[in-house]
Amino acid sequence: MSITSPPIEVSVLTDSIKNLLEKNFLRVVVKGELSNVSLQTSGHLYFAIKDSKAVLNGAFFHFRSKYFDRKPKDGDYVILHGKLTVYAPRGQYQIVAYALTFSGEGNLLQQFEERKQRLAAEGYFDPKRKKPLPSGARVIGVITSPTGAVIQDILRVLSRRCHQFQVILYPVTVQGATAAQEISQAIQFFNQNSMRVHALIIARGGGSIEDLWAFNEEELVKSIVASSIPIISAVGHETDFTLCDFASDVRAPTPSAAAEIVCKSSDQYRQELQNLRRYVSSHARQFIAAKKNLLTHWQRHLASVDFYHTAQQTLDYTRAALERGIETKLEYYKQRFAQYRRWLKSDVLIRIEKHLADLNQSLMLSIKNKIYTKKTSLNQLYTSCLKNELLNLQHRTQHSRNILSQLSRRLHIAIASSQQTHQECLVRLQNELSFTIQHLLTKAKERCQAIQEQASSLNPKNVLKRGFAQLFDFNKHFVIISAESLKQSDLVRVCLQDGEAVVSVKEVWLNNDKKG
């Protein structure tokens, strides 16, 4: 614009700068220290973000509804995502943020993404290497804290969904510097010992990214990949993701869901996969169409949204200025009130007090005379009313006595008749109750005797008395129920009625065929 150009209004120039700024800085990421933080009752956040050389004012609309769990304060180091705009009433440029990350969390998220990309490039998350879950797993290893609610949720689901199962718990700490190492050692323990575990569940409840960081350690990822036993990761809530989830063979949204997954058969998985495929295909088309319509709608109304934000910011600034004005006025009137109080303590106050005392004495004398006159009149009226009321009360009392006498005679007749009827009913009910109690006692005794006989027949010690024996491995870790688990020269502990014996296996037959 040259010197000879016609002058333009400030608002026109400001709008031109605003359009130019918003077009070239539509998406910016700024980091720095917060100052002058103010969270309004409307839920909008106003602040300044600065470094050692510059300061930038900013606004975050509807902040309270998005970040209700933590309120920023002066001195916080943050990373802001937003766009640059101009607040026209003050002629200053500012950032309007739509996302805020505290610096510590930002560093962890960046470290998470870098580690995830590197391990993925090395093949640790390759779907081809993932192992399928066995159908009908019955022996399940669980790696989690022994005191939390997670293990109780898993046991409750397994008890409801699985008919036969055995859980082997390896207790670990699930948070802190040693958690990743303990979980890795647990995975190695199950793989190196012949526990015959069909699947492993690594479980933990929800938490922040710092709480779940142990499950992002590279040591744990490599232990999961090296495991020959299929592993289900059930860490955090459904919205939480860790590197443990990507490395494991199956990811469950919650520990309870992991227990349900391990109980499912391959047919159930296949059916659920087909249903899910149909559901995703159908809803994806609907979702894309809806989002296209929504995008078109918001593109048309984007200008009105910016106008609303500007108006809201003006309203918040006006409210803040009004509050400051009210505080200033209050302070002014407090000072004026103090001046009036000092003035009233002068001679004027003394004259006013004397005049008030004279008025008070005259008023009290007049009140006493009025009270005496009204009291005399009231006593006369009260005496007359009392005599009339007493006469009426005597008439009502006599009438009530007559009615009471009639009711008393009728009540005696009704009570005598009712007692006879109730006595007969009571005798009948006592007879029926005695018969019912005797019948129930007889049935309960018969049922108790049957249960005792059944329990006696199921008692393993009674079975041993009939010539049977129980076989255990040498260390009595598990019961031997199949000849397939035996091989030649194995040492077996035999439990008899009156003692135990250790025997060595010479030969094993399966269905009349010799095993070895």
Swiss-Prot record:
Protein name: Exodeoxyribonuclease 7 large subunit
Main location: cytoplasm
GO molecular function list: exodeoxyribonuclease VII activity; nucleic acid binding
Superkingdom classification of source: Bacteria
Disulfide bonds: none
Record note on quaternary structure: Heterooligomer composed of large and small subunits.
GO CC annotations, alphabetized: cytoplasm; exodeoxyribonuclease VII complex
Keywords linked to the UniProt accession: Cytoplasm, Exonuclease, Hydrolase, Nuclease
InterPro entries given in the database record: Exonuc_VII_L, Exonuc_VII_lsu_C, OB-fold_nuc-bd_dom
Its biological purpose: Bidirectionally degrades single-stranded DNA into large acid-insoluble oligonucleotides, which are then degraded further into small acid-soluble oligonucleotides.
Compartment(s) where it occurs, according to its Swiss-Prot or TrEMBL record: Cytoplasm
BP-aspect Gene Ontology terms: DNA catabolic process
Organism of provenance: Chlamydia trachomatis serovar L2 (strain ATCC VR-902B / DSM 19102 / 434/Bu)
Recorded family membership: Belongs to the XseA family.
EC number: 3.1.11.6
Lineage, opening ranks: Bacteria, Pseudomonadati, Chlamydiota, Chlamydiia, Chlamydiales
Recorded catalytic activity of this chain's protein: Exonucleolytic cleavage in either 5'- to 3'- or 3'- to 5'-direction to yield nucleoside 5'-phosphates
Entry-linked PANTHER family: EXODEOXYRIBONUCLEASE 7 LARGE SUBUNIT
HAMAP family: Exonuc_7_L (MF_00378)
